[in-house]
UniProtKB/Swiss-Prot annotation:
Class of this enzyme: lyase
Residues annotated to bind GTP: R38, R89, T120, K181, R283, T284, R285
Family: Belongs to the radical SAM superfamily. MoaA family.
Pfam families: Mob_synth_C, Radical_SAM
HAMAP family tied to this protein: MoaA_B (MF_01225_B)
Binding site for [4Fe-4S] cluster 2: C278, C281, C295
Enzyme nomenclature, EC number: 4.1.99.22
Residue ranges constituting the Radical SAM core domain according to the UniProt record: 29-254
Pathway: Cofactor biosynthesis; molybdopterin biosynthesis
Name of the protein in question: GTP 3',8-cyclase
Listed cofactors: [4Fe-4S] cluster
Gene that produces this protein: moaA
């Protein structure tokens, strides 16, 4: 058992499968099945959002510790064909920081045809790569965007890059990377502009989802008494729009949806803290260093990279992955007494 850098939790090379049923898919002890794979491919980012990264950025992961494009393609292949994963999303950091992203997408598209390949991005620089990514096989993008006011955006991200983001969003739409969703983190600093952001999304024809801020900030300054809840947001949006509760599009979807002014447009709210959906979670996460993380808030990761580079075959890697998910917690525990946030920030884990 070894410990690695950046405050990463204990990394194990084996796990207990005691009591696990003899099935191929990624089932856990609470009956949940992981079908949605999030693959973080870098810790680097072109922005410095206050809730995600410190101003100086995250410590660089040594190049030899990062999964290569071919290694990621192989693990995605295993996840789909041996473990039952049905959707793959590439995250960061910022995925566009990888110069081999198109190669990675193309390799996955060839190995797992028909499986949706999505990406969460800040869209900085996307205008130059949207067409190539679409040709490689990328299906759609979610864009992280907390404000459409340039000055406010610069304060939140510590970078004046809103024009590039807007150009990237338009380029993605032209390239057919749809349906596109905008993700915005709920904070006191973003609440006043929430209605303006929704207005902009309605005009642009993209779906907006607000996400309650979780204790995953790099500076570890999150405090429950300062967080903006889903109920508070609904009250603010209700001053400008008529919102009608619409529920979830499927039980495992994290966002509760509301019709806006009678529909068909909707706005989603992911109330990760106040309305936890852990009991329906269907996600499994692969970090940029090649470890499986069963939950954003897990204190352990299972090392696939070492096994992969030591000659493990596909079934051996799949079995390690199954063990990681079998031991997934019942929930994130944010509301429990004695909760301790993970040392990894969201930027280091991958969204």
């Amino acid at each position: 058992m070894t410990t690695v850098e950046m405050g990463i939790p204990t990394v194990r090379r084996s796990v207990s499968l005691a009591g696990r049923p003899d099935v191929d898919h990624l089932v856990d002890r609470f009956g949940r099945v992981a079908r949605d794979l999030r693959v973080s491919i870098t810790e680097k980012c072109s922005l410095r959002c206050t809730y995600c990264m410190p101003e100086e950025g995250l410590p660089a992961i040594p190049a030899q510790n990062l999964l290569t494009a071919s290694e990621i393609v192989r693990l995605v292949d295993i996840a789909v064909h041996r473990l039952g994963v049905r959707e793959v999303r590439f995250t960061g950091g910022e995925p566009l920081m990888r110069v081999d992203l198109e190669q990675m997408i193309a390799g996955c598209a060839e190995r797992v045809p028909g499986v949706p390949l999505a990406m969460t991005t800040n869209a900085v620089g996307l205008e130059h790569r949207a067409d190539g990514l679409a040709r490689a096989g990328l299906t759609r993008v979610n864009v992280s965007l907390d404000s459409v006011d340039r000055e406010h955006f610069a304060r939140l991200t510590r970078r004046d890059r809103l024009p590039s983001v807007m150009a990237g969003i338009r380029a993605a739409a032209r390239a057919g990377l749809a349906p596109m969703k905008i993700n915005a983190v709920l904070m006191p600093e973003t609440l006043s502009g929430a209605a303006d952001l929704l207005e902009w999304c309605l005009r642009e024809g993209v779906t907006l989802r607000f996400i309650e801020e979780m204790p995953l900030d790099a500076d570890h300054e999150w405090a429950r008494e300062n967080m903006v809840t889903a109920d508070r947001l609904l009250a603010v949006l209700g001053e400008r729009f008529t919102l009608t509760e619409h529920g979830r599009e499927d039980p495992s979807a994290p966002a509760e949806e509301w019709l806006v002014d009678g529909g068909p447009a909707t706005v989603g709210i992911i109330a990760s803290v106040t309305r936890s959906f852990c009991s329906d979670c269907d996600r499994t996460r692969l970090t940029a260093e090649g470890t499986v993380r069963s939950c954003l808030f897990s204190d352990q990761e299972i090392d696939l990279r070492s096994a992969l580079r030591s000659g493990a075959d596909d079934e051996e890697l799949a079995q390690l992955w199954r063990g990681a998910m079998w031991n997934k917690w019942a929930g994130h525990g944010i509301n429990a007494d004695g909760f301790a946030p993970p040392q990894r920030s969201m930027g280091a884990i991958g969204g």
